[in-house]
Curated annotation (Swiss-Prot):
The gene is lipA. This is Lipoyl synthase. Binds 2 [4Fe-4S] clusters per subunit. One cluster is coordinated with 3 cysteines and an exchangeable S-adenosyl-L-methionine. It comes from Delftia acidovorans (strain DSM 14801 / SPH-1). Disulfide bonds: none annotated. Pathway: Protein modification; protein lipoylation via endogenous pathway; protein N(6)-(lipoyl)lysine from octanoyl-[acyl-carrier-protein]: step 2/2. CDD domains: Radical_SAM (cd01335). GO terms for molecular function: 4 iron, 4 sulfur cluster binding; lipoate synthase activity; metal ion binding.
Length: 326
């Protein structure tokens, strides 16, 4: 099989607009790696999503989100489970805009110079959650390397507003790594800690340079360990993708590293390339292998492990949390 190397030439200064949201090829043209593509692997039957007809609830949620100028990672990251989750009245809200300061080549969230924070967003988010009568919410964000606190203060404002309007709603936050600002961010989060603290490791350390440029494996592990030391009763959680070129043993070692850093909950799912411009799928992991990962997770002491081809970090997050005793 012949492998074609796609070398993405940098856009000229005249073409590049840092204020515009860049997606796919436009986003990845300026990263310092070569994205190599061979013949695309055929998707096996076990990873196909059952497409259902959009429900009234699906459209209701989309209308409410647009009316309140809110974003979901479900939409921005092209999650394959969006139909099911929206249809059941659940969503993962993405705060601080829809332009990320990073250019991870596995991710479909747009890149660009972020807009100033919307000071009305925490209240709008809280009103939306109350209107939808959600009992469990996940709040994530784009990376905001432009902010001195990495956006941690905005997370706190969102949590406070949600608890004011929906005191019984449980809140999971899926945070960026707060690169270089972790101690400041953790200090700020003390004002309103979540019910579950989630930060994804994404892949094995060997693949970080390719998959997570600008991030550091040990830094991400330490972020969750530091949070756990400050809030020992709050469950910590992390997720891994498979299919980027890692081995089974590398996944097991990441799991061991997670437990060594006091991470309680785990998600593992199959990586699916959002477009032909993104990192290609190197392998499709068989359900039997996912089952092995799940069994090993419980042997290692994880309180809950959601493992399977279509599992995503916030997929059935409420069920994951409740199974872990939240």
């Amino acid at each position: 099989m012949t492998t074609n190397t796609v070398v993405r030439e940098a856009q000229s200064q005249a073409e590049y607009n840092p204020l515009a949201k860049q997606k796919a090829a436009a986003k990845l043209s300026r990263i310092p790696i070569k994205v190599e593509h061979g013949e695309a692997l055929k998707k096996p039957d076990w990873i196909r999503v059952k497409a259902g007809s959009p429900t009234t609830r699906f459209y209701e949620i989309k209308d409410i989100l647009r009316a309140n100028k809110l974003h979901t990672v479900c939409e921005e990251a092209s999650c394959p489970n969006i139909g099911e989750c929206f249809g059941k009245g659940t969503a993962t809200f993405m705060i601080m805009g829809d332009k990320c300061t990073r250019r991870c080549p596995f991710c479909d969230v747009g890149h660009g110079r972020p807009d100033p924070l919307d000071t009305n967003e925490p209240l709008n988010l809280a009103k939306t959650i109350a209107e939808l009568r959600l009992k469990y919410v996940v709040i994530t964000s784009v990376d905001r390397d432009d902010l001195r606190d990495g956006g941690s203060g905005h997370f706190v404002e969102c949590i406070k507003n949600i608890r004011e309007l929906s005191p019984l709603t449980q809140i999971e936050i899926l945070v960026p790594d707060f690169r270089g600002r972790d101690d400041r961010a953790l200090e700020i989060l003390k004002a309103a800690p979540p019910d579950v603290m989630n930060h994804n490791l994404e892949t094995a350390p060997r693949l970080y340079k390719e998959a997570r440029p600008g991030s550091d494996y040990q830094f991400s592990l330490n972020l969750l360990k530091k949070f756990k030391a400050l809030h020992p009763k709050v469950p910590t959680k992390s997720g891994i993708m498979v299919g980027l070129g890692e081995t089974d043993e590398e996944i097991l070692q990441v799991m061991r590293d997670m437990r060594a850093h006091d991470i309680d909950m785990l998600t593992i799912g199959q990586y699916l390339a959002p477009s032909n411009s993104h990192l290609p799928v190197r392998r499709y992991v068989h359900p039997d292998t996912f089952k092995m990962f799940e069994e090993e997770a419980y042997k290692m002491g994880f309180t809950h492990a959601a493992v399977g081809a279509m599992v995503r970090s916030s997929y059935h997050a409420d069920q994951q949390a409740h199974a872990a005793g939240v």
